[in-house]
Amino acid sequence: YVALCELLNEVAPIAGAKKSILSNSGAEAVENAIKIARSYTKRAGVLCFEGGYHGRTLLTLSLTSKYGLFKNGLGPFAPEIYRIPAPEPYRKPPQFTDEQYVDACIAQLERAMVAQIDPSALAAIIIEPVQGEAGFIPMPKRFLQRIRELCTQHGIVMIADEVQTFGRTGTLFACEQLGVQPDVVTVAKALGAGLPIAATIGRAEIMDAPHLGAVGGTYGGSPLACVAAIEAVNQLRSPAFLAQVTHVGHLMCSELMAMQGNNKLIGDVRGLGPMLLVELVLDRETKAPAPAHALAVIKRCVANGLVLIRAGLYSN
């Protein structure tokens, strides 16, 4: 347990002294992050984003988007959750340039701190650096950096949910490529190499805030899972592995973009490193989603030994 926490503290893209706590799943890691942020700030509000996926426990489901698939019939949900749209460059208004669109998203973020909740009542802003379930959408660097600035200015804890991105984007953490240092980061999935383990890593002064007994669990950080995670982290951060990840990412992206040029059904190819997605649309002008086509493609791929999954708000 201690050896894994020390390793995570070493590699996490967080400024200053760090501490970690282990748990069983990404959802539990996110729950811990919110509890710790609330303990540290003595505030309750949490700002999250449309398209976000943070888990399926009650609190993390409250933070999660895509109502019909994940949330239908499971309310009421946790209070003090505030949600605004996240940047989605592929579907930006056509009159905007890329930079103008990011400006508009930042303006929307700043407006939320007047129209929805005062910054003095916000404990945390939680965001996936690459939104996974929303459709592998990398957040614009400038948008993340503005979140960082606002959190620093108002004493808000910035939480990066890297449960899905950890080890999958060409760097150990996606934040490393997107130019931002969060206060707290959550990791799971690839961390355990198939075994159930997750971690919440953060600035030491924040992690020390909860009272004794406030955060923990019986099975968090089992010896077997810790051994697997230590080996996984060391493999994932090795220069040879990262070089291969970068190579595969470039290869996949170039091949998928070539396919896009020959198939009007492919509206967009996007992601970060080898964490890539193809969005299927009925029409490239209207960008009308094509979920039935996506399901048909997936079934054919699975039948031929290639495992794919659907993602995105429209499952396309």
Positions of predicted regions on the chain:
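Conserved N-terminal phosphate-binding loop of PLP-dependent enzymes in the Aspartate aminotransferase
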Residues: Y1-N316
